[in-house]
Each structure stands twice: as structure tokens, then as C-alpha cells.
A protein has these predicted regions:
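Active-site core of glycosidic bond-cleaving carbohydrate-active enzymes
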Residues: 1-216
Length: 216
């Protein structure tokens, strides 16, 4: 469902086409209200079934990881993404001339960010939840990290990727969307290059070596 909002915003940013934002705003608002009323508990979105889908398992013989430490908490994923949707809805409301809606979304986003950090952020280690790359990366790129902790959270992304994942792909379908962008934005260019050029498991190069014509 998040694609509904992201695509509308992408069309506007890339082409200046705001028709989707104008025409679809009422249905977007209904969906946000539905999620807030039925899937939120203490400002944490508890609706998530798939998690960071297809996080590379420990070996290519496995379909899914058997190690809980490699799995990102579904509430982390759903809450960070919902927070980013609220930021979009604040912008969409302003574009539609609805300042009251914009204020409502901004206020809700603040409450979610506060509750999220109280539940999942460890200020002593600058880690989110169980310190997966995806948990730290989404919190960072989607704007939930408390001021002053950004570099420390990013350092955890780098350390986890280099140490535990040996410089290989370290996220599933949700985290991977932010991995290359996050590394380049925060100065991890060499690590990004290493990940892209690896040809051992798990990596895109490994897929190519095995004859893949699409991403597994």
C-alpha cells in the first residue's frame, strides 16, 4: 500500500505531475485513517506480516533465515514506513489547500517518532531494536533518528555490514531500497562499491555468476 503514496510523490518530483496527489488524496486519507484507527497501538503500527522479506539467509541452501538476529522486527518496518507516509500526507494536504489536515498529520508524526524511539532506540549504543542493518537504516533515512545520533546510527550500519555480513548484501526487499542511497549519503562510498562488486554469496554478482537474469 505504501507504493500508492510513493508513486504519487515520485510522479510529482520527477515530472511535476500533481494530478495523482490531487485526485487520490481522499482515498489516501481514508487509508491513513483506517491504519491509525485499526492497526496502531500506543503510536506503534503493529500491522506487519512479512517483515524485511527475502533477507539473505545464512547459506544459499536455505530459503529463509533461521537466525532471529538477522530478522528485522515487523513493528520497526511498519512504523518507520508509516511515519514516512505521514510526512508525504502533510505535503499532499498542503498542496491540496488543506492546512488543518497538514497540521494533523504533522502532529501525529511527532507522536509516532517519540513513541518509536522510546520503544526501539537504545541511546547508549545508538542501535535500533536488534541492530539489523535495515532497522538502523530505515530509522536513519526516514527521519526518525534523534538529532545528534545520525552519525552513530550510520556507524552501526557500516559495522554490521562489514563485520557480520562481511561486506555483502545485508537487507531484504525493504532495507535494500535504502542501502545504496544511505551509504552514499553518509559517506560509505567504498562499502557501497564493495557490495556492488562482490560475486560471492550473498550478492548481485553471485546471482549473475549463477546465470540469473533477474534479481532472486
Amino acid at each position: 500500500p505504501a507504493a500508492y503514496f510513493y508513486v504519487a510523490d515520485m510522479l510529482y518530483r520527477q515530472f511535476g505531475d500533481d494530478s495523482s496527489i490531487k485526485e487520490r488524496y481522499p482515498s489516501m486519507k481514508r487509508w491513513v485513517n483506517h491504519m491509525t484507527e485499526t492497526k496502531m497501538k500506543d503510536y506503534i503500527l503493529v500491522k506487519d506480516e512479512y517483515g524485511d522479506w527475502c533477507m539473505p539467509p545464512e547459506s544459499p541452501e536455505l530459503i529463509h533465515s533461521e537466525d532471529p538476529a538477522r530478522k528485522t522486527n515487523g513493528e520497526v518496518l511498519s512504523t518507520t514506513v508509516f511515519y514516512s507516509i505521514l510526512q508525504l500526507m502533510e505535503k499532499f494536504a498542503q498542496m491540496n489547500g488543506l492546512p488543518a489536515d497538514a497540521e494533523e498529520y504533522a502532529a501525529l508524526a511527532i507522536k509516532i517518532k517519540d513513541a518509536y524511539n522510546k520503544k526501539f532506540f537504545n541511546p547508549g549504543t545508538a542501535q535500533y531494536d536488534n541492530n539489523t542493518v535495515t532497522a538502523n537504516l530505515l530509522s536513519l533515512r526516514l527521519g526518525l533518528v534523534p538529532d545528534g545520533y545520525e552519525d552513530k546510527v550510520f556507524a552501526n550500519v557500516v559495522e554490521k555490514t562489514e563485520k557480520d555480513c562481511k561486506g555483502h548484501v545485508s537487507a531484504g526487499v525493504l532495507g535494500i531500497q535504502h542501502l545504496m542511497r544511505g551509504l552514499t549519503e553518509y559517506g560509505g562510498l567504498e562499502l557501497a562499491y564493495k557490495i556492488v562488486t562482490n560475486d560471492t554469496y550473498p550478492s548481485w554478482g553471485y546471482m549473475i555468476k549463477k546465470g540469473a537474469t533477474t534479481i532472486w
